[in-house]
């Protein structure tokens, strides 16, 4: 659904204003990791529930209930992993540019996976699964598990 992807791409970070990310000009009170859940709440109130799920599920490469508990994240304990192809596409595309460098540097696959692996190897596996799904290039870092079955 191309129209939905475009709309969701514009809206997926709407919750960032509720977070405290001074480097991004955000003076809210919540940790940055909460921007997806906050975005979902905003869009749900506007009747845009499907778009809200994109907000909630794009953070990192999705966050499972297990990871929320294990890492003591200030998030609801539920799986927030992208499920639809549209959710997965926005999650994938979101990893290539950072808000902190004014979007001037497109990250490589290696940079993205290294950054995600700092948090948990499963995150890098999930990203590589997305890369296989959306890339036309052969996967240069074939990994065993897809990362989606957890």
Report the location of each language-model feature.
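C-terminal/domain-terminus segments
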Residues: 104-126
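Divalent metal-dependent catalytic cores for phosphoryl transfer on phosphate-bearing substrates
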Residues: 1-110
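Charged phosphate-binding loop/patch that engages nucleotide di/tri-phosphates or the phosphate backbone
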Residues: 118-150
């Amino acid at each position: 659904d191309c129209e939905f992807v475009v709309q969701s791409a514009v809206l997926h970070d709407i919750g960032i204003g509720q977070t405290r990310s001074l480097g991004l000009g955000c003076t809210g009170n919540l940790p940055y990791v909460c921007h997806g859940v906050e975005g979902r709440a905003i869009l749900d109130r506007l009747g845009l529930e499907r778009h809200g799920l994109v907000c909630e599920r794009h953070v990192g490469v999705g966050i499972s209930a297990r990871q929320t508990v294990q890492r003591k994240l200030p998030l609801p304990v539920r799986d927030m992993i992208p499920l639809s192809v549209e959710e997965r596409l926005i999650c994938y595309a979101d990893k290539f540019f950072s808000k902190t460098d004014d979007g001037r540097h497109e990250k490589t696959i290696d940079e993205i996976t290294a950054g995600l692996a700092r948090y948990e190897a499963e995150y890098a596996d999930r990203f590589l699964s997305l890369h296989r799904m959306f890339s036309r290039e052969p996967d240069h870092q074939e990994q065993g598990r897809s990362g989606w079955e957890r």
